[in-house]
Each structure stands twice: as structure tokens, then as C-alpha cells.
Amino acid sequence: GLDAILEVNNEYPAINPSPRVARSLIQFPQTQILDTFANKVGASNWSSSLKLFIADAEGINADTTIKVYPVSGSWNNGTGQYLDSPITTNGVSWGSRFYSQSGDWDTAGGDYLTDYSASQVIGIRTVKDLNIDVGNIVTEWSASNIDNYGFMVKLTGSQEFVSSSAVQPILKYYSVDTNTIYPPVLEIKWDDSSFETGSLSEISTT
């Protein structure tokens, strides 16, 4: 949707206790990725990172682990925002890829390719911003080996659907619709430096 916040969490409320899991989808234009590699990176050594900037974090344990996967099917962003009333249902949801009751995911919560993944462990006293090496995923997109349907950002499997008040990390990151200067970034860095070897002539002392 158009909400300013992306959420990744496993919330376990005290009232009507049942795990409430949130995952986020982020997509960067394939045309920009291909252009970057064709016209800028070339044959240079490169690396790529997904950067998300934290807005709020609660319930972090010593080993809270964020996983990133490539989404395996198309989806519609929609125009909804948190706490819309009535609820806006014209975009991707836990059960549907496009809008309410249309184009269901094969697996509720979103379909993604498990052959490619990246992760970052967040600790109690560490920085909560994400800076995850996603080079293995971007490699496949840049070579058009897999379709670019964006990233799935989620907690690792063992930290989702946990019925315990001791395991309920709630992470909120700024989305592209934030009014801050901290939207998500797909950073691609490369080394295009070059050098020339010089030559020295012997200096005569006579």
C-alpha cells in the first residue's frame, strides 16, 4: 500500500493471544538494475546491499534474524494505509497477490524462492537498520535468470508464529512513501578505478 511504514514482526498480544505475523514486500525497477549493470558496472567487481532504515523497534532478542528472499510472483502494491476505515483491499495481502480474494498466493503470506536468500542478525544493542548483502539475488536479476518481483523481508521461520510473549520482535522500517529522507535503498557498488604503471630512468651521479 501507500503506508509510510514497512513492518516485520511476530506480535503475541495479551488479549486474544494468537501470533500476528507481518512481512513486507519491496520492489526496485528491473530497468534501472539492467541499466546500471549495462552502462555503469560493466565488468567491474561489484556488491549489492538492501538498506532499510528503522523507525521503531520493540521486543528484540539477542538473535532476532531478518531473512530476505526474491518474491516468485507478481503482486499489486495497492493504495491502502494502516487503519484505513473502511479497509482498502485493492492491493497485496497475506492471502492475495493483487486484491482481496483475487490471485491467491500458493502459500499464505507470500511466495518466494528459497534457493536465494540473505540475512542479518539484529541484537539488543546493535543498530536496527538493515544493510543486507543481496548480491546473490541481484546477480540473478541482472542476468535475467529469474524474474524481478522484488524482495520478501521477514523474520526467520523459527521466529514466526511463536506463541510466547518472550518472542515477539516488532520492527518498523520506513517505506518509499515516508516523508523522511530514509526510503528503502538497493545499493550497488562497483570498483571502476584504473591505474597506469610508470617508468623510472636511472639518474646518473656523474
Annotate each predicted stretch with a short phrase.
Residues 51-94, 155-159, 176:
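Short edge-strand/loop segments of extracellular domains
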Residues 37, 59-62, 160-167:
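Extracytoplasmic/secreted cell-surface and envelope-processing proteins
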Residues 24, 64-66, 184:
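Short beta-strand/loop motifs in extracellular/secreted proteins, especially
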Residues 1-12, 29-30, 49-52, 90-192:
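Cysteine-clustered segments with highest specificity for TGF-beta superfamily mature ligands
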